[in-house]
Amino acid sequence: SDSQSEMSTRLDGIMASVGYGDVVIYQLPTWNGREFDQAFISKLKILQAKLVTFIHDVPPLMFPSNYYLMPEYIDMYNQSDAVIVPSEQMRDKLLAEGLTVDKILVQSMWDHPYDLPLHQPQFARKLYFAGSVERFPHLSNWSYATPLEIFSPEEESNPEANVSYRGWVSRPELLLELSKGGLGLVWGVEENPADEPEYYGLNISHKSATYLAAGIPVIVPSYLSNAELIREHGLGFVVDSLEEASRIVESLTAEEYQATVERVRKFSFLLKEGYFSKKVLVDAVMEVLS
């Protein structure tokens, strides 16, 4: 790793274009280590720059074994003029941990920009899951009535499971396949929501943005940080179990599906155009300049 002087020289190069009093958006973590991040922030302070910290993930909450580092992260966040947090739940958690920044903005949703023509989703009673079965092993035993298609290499499969594996595909291919019709499943690493680690209810899922960008409705667990947004805009269904998820798909009519798809179509335009990122960044700049 760099010595203090080497790191300082490297940061001077990275920050060469930052002028006195500029607004700087700093996305954390950089995964370069806390020493790097703190040194970067200290140099910004010398330039009297306005610092907006865009909190993507919080390592001490992501990894319980790192929780002892929480005070150091809070101290780093507290040097910001404004912070952007993924969710209201994360805001409340960080405030409880000692966050004192007055200007806190909530991201709520990831965008999913793309530039390719997609299919018009057709009614199909099936669920998609985009994610590695290695990380979500309980899905390999899916035995509900609704078929589940998983975009992941096949693991040792359970012959009783109602699952098919689609392998890894590129991002454009994934959007094209999803857009043919069906519903996208967002779920945590545990089958039973009561066993789910707290973090999954604090951050925001990239999966929900992927499915919605593809134009298909989503089924999400009630503990998901933006479940209320999905319910409020009628973009799919909020459930408390996988059994309930399957039951909803089995009882869904073609008319209900198409009505939901129409709502998703309007919403997906925002994700395609990067609306959520643009809005929260513009709002953050306005906050620190006002």
Q: PLM ranges: what are they?
A:
Residues 172, 176-213, 220-228:
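Nucleotide-sugar-dependent
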Residues 112-180:
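Conserved catalytic-core segment of nucleotide-activated headgroup transferases in glycan assembly
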Residues 240-247, 254-290:
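A charged, aromatic-enriched C-terminal amphipathic alpha-helix characteristic of glycosyltransferases
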Residues 2-92:
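Extended catalytic core of nucleotide-activated donor transferases of GT-like folds
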Residues 81-95, 100-116:
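Donor nucleotide-sugar binding/catalytic pocket of nucleotide-sugar-dependent glycosyltransferases
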Residues 85, 220-221, 239:
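Short beta-strand scaffold positions
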Residues 233-239:
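A short acidic/histidine/glycine-rich donor-binding loop in glycosyltransferase catalytic cores
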Residues 89-91, 134-135, 225-226, 244:
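Alpha-helix capping/helix-boundary segments
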